[in-house]
Amino acid sequence: MSVDVRPFPRVDWSPIPAEGATGVDSRALLHADGLFVAQLRFAEHATIHEHPSANEIVALCLEGEGFTSVGDETAPIRAGEQAHWPPNVPHRLWTEGSTMLTLMIERPSAE
C-alpha cells in the first residue's frame, strides 16, 4: 500500500460574502465527501449573523476570544475551547473587543 499524498488548492483569505457577516475573513481548507473545513478570522466587533445550518458544525477557537449563541443560549468562547452547533438550530459567532481565529468543521448530520 502506498501513501496517498496529493495537492489541495491554497485559498487566500477573503471576506465572507453572506449578508449579515461583517469583519470576518475566511479560507476554505477542505471540501470533500460532505465534509467542509475552513478557517475564519474575526476582527474586533465582527459578526456572523444568526442562521441555521442543515449540517452539524464544530467551531474550534484557535486564537483570541469571542462569543457564540445557540438557540436562546449565549456563551463566551476562548482559545482552546470549542462550540458544537446541532443541525437546524440557529447559531451565531461574534467578537467584541478582541480578535479571534477559528477552525470550522461542518459535516452532514448523522440524523
Predicted feature residues:
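Short, conserved beta-strand element in jelly-roll/cupin
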Residues: 41-43, 52-68
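Short, surface-exposed secondary-structure edge patches
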Residues: 39, 58, 73-75
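Ligand-binding loop in jelly-roll beta-barrel domains
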Residues: 87-111
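Conserved short histidine dyad/triad with adjacent acidic residue
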Residues: 36-53, 87
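A short, N-terminal "cap"/entry segment at the start of jelly-roll beta-barrel domains
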Residues: 1-34, 38
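Short acidic-glycine-tyrosine-enriched beta hairpin
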Residues: 72-88
